[in-house]
Curated annotation (Swiss-Prot):
<feature type="transmembrane region" description="Helical">
    <location>
        <begin position="209"/>
        <end position="229"/>
    </location>
</feature>
<comment type="similarity">
    <text>Belongs to the TMEM176 family.</text>
</comment>
<keyword id="KW-0472">Membrane</keyword>
<dbReference type="GO" id="GO:2001199">
    <property type="term" value="P:negative regulation of dendritic cell differentiation"/>
</dbReference>
<protein>
    <recommendedName>
        <fullName>Transmembrane protein 176B</fullName>
    </recommendedName>
</protein>
<feature type="transmembrane region" description="Helical">
    <location>
        <begin position="95"/>
        <end position="115"/>
    </location>
</feature>
<keyword id="KW-0539">Nucleus</keyword>
<keyword id="KW-0597">Phosphoprotein</keyword>
<comment type="function">
    <text>May play a role in the process of maturation of dendritic cells. Required for the development of cerebellar granule cells.</text>
</comment>
<feature type="region of interest" description="Disordered">
    <location>
        <begin position="237"/>
        <end position="270"/>
    </location>
</feature>
<feature type="transmembrane region" description="Helical">
    <location>
        <begin position="65"/>
        <end position="85"/>
    </location>
</feature>
<dbReference type="GO" id="GO:0031965">
    <property type="term" value="C:nuclear membrane"/>
</dbReference>
<dbReference type="InterPro" id="IPR009281">
    <property type="entry name" value="TMEM176A/TMEM176B"/>
</dbReference>
<feature type="modified residue" description="Phosphoserine">
    <location>
        <position position="236"/>
    </location>
</feature>
<keyword id="KW-1133">Transmembrane helix</keyword>
<dbReference type="Pfam" id="PF04103">
    <property type="entry name" value="CD20"/>
</dbReference>
<feature type="compositionally biased region" description="Polar residues">
    <location>
        <begin position="260"/>
        <end position="270"/>
    </location>
</feature>
Length: 270
């Protein structure tokens, strides 16, 4: 350790010995898992929170357009399945006509979403959201009716065991008995019943397909409603963002006060 000497007013004064300087260097290396999580967070921020607002608005518009087209297609498929159900035996599902009114409301909701994407605005957004909400409600009602049809009306073909039987006349004659014996081999009961079983399975498959379409309508309506609400919230917050950006630009362009001016003003006040 060295001792320094300081001369004050011609008098030598000894200062305290200087202490040795210690430099602590800490090297910290992050683990690979931490770096991977940071990279995933950066990717998520890039995908879901892009820096530019124009691509985000365009992406929301494409999502609305795709969801609207999907809703229209699901509504058309629902109406087609409703026609197939009406051609089958009587059921509560076919008598309610839920395939037609649920499909029509979903088609209207899809058309509203497309119109809102082409002509954005608050009024169009509110109308599109209301139509989408109505489509969601009707799709849920159709799902409930379809599930009840599967639970409570499991066998719509009540006459399947007797439809393949030939009816006998009240007073059979001798000629009829002879005809029946000769044509009995031509009438194939087993084949008739096999066809009826195929028809039963086909009708059950149509009902199951209609249930799947209704579930898809519920999901698509929920997603479309979420996208529409997000678009409305983005439109309402856009003026606030523009005002904040203008304030930031004005703050950056303002000239900061110089220290000389501050000192001059202070001297004048004193």
């Amino acid at each position: 350790m060295t001792q320094n000497t300081v001369i004050v007013n011609g008098v030598a004064m000894a200062s305290r010995p200087s202490q040795p300087t210690h430099v602590n260097v800490h090297i910290h290396q992050e683990s690979a898992l931490t770096q991977l999580l940071k990279a995933g967070g950066s990717l998520k921020k890039f995908l879901f929170h892009p820096g530019d607002t124009v691509p985000s608005t365009a992406r929301i518009g494409y999502e609305q357009l795709a969801l609207g087209v999907t809703q229209i297609l699901l509504g058309v498929v629902s109406c087609v399945l409703g026609v197939c159900l009406s051609l089958g035996p009587w059921t509560v599902l076919s008598a309610s006509g839920c395939a037609f009114w649920a499909g029509s409301v979903v088609i209207a909701a899809g058309a509203g979403a497309i119109v809102h994407e082409k002509h954005p605005g608050k009024l169009a957004g509110y109308i599109s959201s209301l139509l989408t909400l109505a489509g969601f409600a009707t799709a849920m009602a159709a799902v409930v009716l379809c599930v009840n049809s599967f639970i409570w009306q499991t066998e719509p073909f009540l006459y399947i065991d007797t439809v393949c039987d030939r009816s006998d006349p009240v007073f059979p004659t001798t000629g009829y008995r002879w005809m029946r014996r000769s044509q009995e081999n031509q009438w194939q009961k087993e084949e008739c019943r096999a066809y009826m079983q195929m028809l039963r399975k086909l009708f059950t498959a149509i009902r199951a397909l209609f249930l799947a379409v209704c579930v898809l309508k519920v999901i698509v309506s929920l997603v479309s409603l979420g996208v529409g609400l997000r678009n409305l919230c983005g439109q309402s917050s856009q003026p606030l963002n523009e005002e904040g950006s203008e304030k930031r630009l004005l703050g950056e362009n303002s000239v900061p006060p110089s220290p000389s001016r501050e000192q001059t003003s202070t001297a004048i006040v004193l």
